[in-house]
Amino acid sequence: MILMNKILKYLFLMISKVFSFAIFSVIFLLLFLQFETLNLQSLNPIIKTNYVEKHLKRTDFDINYINLKFDKNSNELIFTIDSAFKNKINASEWMLFIRSELKINVLLNILEKKIFTFTVSSIEKKEDEAISDFNFYGSLNSLKNTNMIEIKGSAKDLPLIFVKDLWPENLGKGARAWTNRSLFEGIISNLEFDSEFVLKKNGELLYEPVINLDFNFNDINTYYLKGMPPMTDTLGTGHLDFNKFRINLIDGRINLDDGTRIYINNGKFNAFDIKQRHGPGQILIDASSNVGDFFNLLSKHDYISKLVKLNRDNLFGESKLKLQFDFPLKNSVKFSETKTNINLEVGELKIYNKNKNVSIIGDSALLILDYDINEARFFKGSIKTKSIKILELPVFAQILDVSIPGLSNISDGGRDITFGTSNFDVELSNQGINIFDGILKPESNLPVVGNSLGLSISGKYFFDEKLIDFNGTVVPVSWLNNLPSNVPILGELFSGSKDGEGLIGIKFRIYSENGDEVKIETNPLSVLTPGFLQRIFD
């Protein structure tokens, strides 16, 4: 409502100036009745001082022609102004030559409803930078108990800098600041405007005004988060009404410094209540790229880079990313003020080790993370995979070597071990990653099919200290392990309280202290021990 009041105040200020100008002109007309038309070019300095220099500080403005005419047939005073607007800093960026015409009915009768009408239209010029399609018109109508203002218009091929330059400083300060800070270059290819204000005779709004502004845009560079590379080559639509503002991004891309690209398939910006100070805002991004490029992008952000420690060269797989940011609409927004959701889906994932050899292959992986400062100062979420095949992972091989000799040959080119599915609940902060109840289930419950193996793991990895501390259970021969679980009452005693525990299970610990090498320990008392006794020896 505050923004709307400013708009109306600005509108009424302009109307009052028009009427003041009209009264002055009528007096001028009465003094010189012998003329049918008057040249008012001498008013040019007054108009520039009282309007242009106050409200359009980034624009050069010149009046080429001012004329006043009284039409006896229609009883109208007709003001005609030919003027030129140019970008003050760089006139080659845009020019607008317009003809404005204001018709004031000076002899209203009971049948006459229109108090005044106006039109603003572009004049075609040879200059390449000149805007050639700009047309607005409106009227003030007197009804029985109310007055109604109607304003309509359309425009094509407006440079974004034109919108910035002609945006009054005191009108919609927050939106204006965000536009100046976040949007650059590009074209408003098509714009349609329609509005209606119904006022009481005392000038107060009778009810909520109707405002609809629809536009198409292309090639606008958009900075969505501080420090991140912008979206470019954009194509989309926008809508503004009395309550909300939204932008739909149809296409775009993010160019990374190594020459790779992230393709934006769909995006949205929503300001759900523009009347509310610091009202709710939302950004949605739907993108596709190589998973390594996504991590490369996230590493550009000052805060997120502290959480994302994976090198893009370690990851490969075509992926789809969905990002959601909810935040207050104000001039400066801290990351801690946002609610963030990350949904990353990867197909045919490959993870490489430091020797550039394929270490892990997966049919698919899904990462879901949420960040809410009101709940905690870290990301919470889960990682899910399907058909993960471990080819070469030294730490895992050492666990198997200590626990189950004969299965550890995955570290030297032997048979791989495949897990059918996995699920990890995780917390991610700038200190490290915490895994809760990580479960890797076997591909087959038949021990004769491949290396059938289950595993559970929990623990934490500290980024800066490079310290790890994980505990887990290796459960071989899942088919045999699951037999007791089918026995009523006794099933839980023998199979354990968690997925991944069973009649036969080997407890292990992976840890490091003071930056030393990683150590692996197993609990020999947990081997061939029922699940409820395994928990005793933890």
How would you label these PLM feature ranges?
Residues 2-35, 200-202, 298-302, 310, ...:
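Extended terminal
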Residues 151-153, 215, 249, 285-287, ...:
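Membrane-embedded beta-strand positions of outer-membrane beta-barrel proteins
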Residues 81-88, 121-123, 194-198, 216-223, ...:
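Generic short beta-strand segments
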Residues 30-115:
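Terminal hydrophobic membrane-targeting helix
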Residues 2-9, 49, 53-54, 60, ...:
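Secondary-structure transition motifs
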Residues 84-85, 112-116, 167-177, 214-220, ...:
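Flexible, solvent-exposed coil segments and beta strand-coil junctions
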